C-alpha cells in the first residue's frame, strides 16, 4: 500500500493522549479524499507495554468498526529493513535495530541481511562489551532511537551507527 497521510511526534511519551486525535484526523482525511482503508497495521513490539496496549486497542477497535484486517508489524524487523534499504552496506554486515528502554537498556535484536535472527529479540543492558563477540568478527549497523545512547559506549572498530531511522506510526 501507499501511505496517504501520517503524523509525527517527537515530544516524548505523549502518544497515549494524541493517538485518538491523530486517528480521527486521518479518518477525516480518508473520508474527505475518498481513500478506502483496506487494513490497519500496528506494532507488535517490543516496546512500552502500556504504549503497545493502547496502540493495539485502538487498532482493534478500528478494525472491528471498519471490518478490515489487522496487520501486526514487528518493530525491530521494520527498523532493520528500513536501515537496509536507506543505506548501502556490504552483504556480510549484521543489523542491530534498537528501541530506547530507559537508562542504559534497549529492546534489540541482531539480524543478517535476510532478516534471520542472529541474536533474538530481548531487553539488553548496554555496556562496552555488548555484542562484542559478534563485533570481533563482523560489522554491525546500529540504528533506531536506542542506538544514540550506545554510540558513546560501544566503541568497537566494527560498529557503525546510522541516525534518523525511527519507526513511522501511520
Can you say where each PLM-predicted feature lies in the sequence?
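Surface "functional belts" at beta-alpha junctions
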Residues: 2, 69-168
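Residues at secondary-structure transition points
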Residues: 10-18, 49-53, 57, 74, ...
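Short glycine-aspartate micro-motif
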Residues: 37-43, 51, 94-98
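Buried hydrophobic packing segments
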Residues: 23, 58-62, 79-83
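Stable alpha-helical structural segments in soluble proteins, enriched in small hydrophobic residues
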Residues: 26-30, 65, 83, 169-170
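N-terminal beta-alpha supersecondary unit
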Residues: 1-46
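DPxDG-like acidic metal-binding loop motif
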Residues: 41-75
Amino acid at each position: 500500500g501507499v501511505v496517504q497521510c501520517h503524523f509525527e511526534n517527537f515530544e516524548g511519551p505523549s502518544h497515549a493522549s494524541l493517538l485518538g486525535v491523530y486517528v480521527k484526523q486521518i479518518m477525516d482525511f480518508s473520508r474527505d479524499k475518498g481513500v478506502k482503508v483496506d487494513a490497519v497495521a500496528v506494532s507488535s513490539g517490543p516496546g512500552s507495554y502500556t504504549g503497545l496496549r493502547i496502540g493495539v486497542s485502538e487498532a482493534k477497535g478500528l478494525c472491528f468498526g471498519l471490518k478490515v484486517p489487522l496487520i501486526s508489524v514487528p518493530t525491530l524487523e521494520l527498523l532493520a529493513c528500513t536501515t537496509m534499504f536507506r543505506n548501502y552496506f556490504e552483504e556480510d554486515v549484521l543489523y542491530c535495530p534498537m528501541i530506547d528502554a530507559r537508562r542504559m537498556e534497549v529492546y534489540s535484536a541482531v539480524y543478517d541481511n535476510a532478516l534471520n535472527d542472529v541474536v533474538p529479540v530481548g531487553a539488553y543492558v548496554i555496556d562496552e562489551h555488548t555484542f562484542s563477540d559478534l563485533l570481533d568478527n563482523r560489522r554491525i549497523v546500529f540504528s533506531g532511537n536506542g542506538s544514540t545512547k550506545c554510540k558513546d559506549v560501544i566503541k568497537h572498530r566494527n560498529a557503525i551507527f546510522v541516525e534518523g531511522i525511527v519507526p513511522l506510526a501511520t
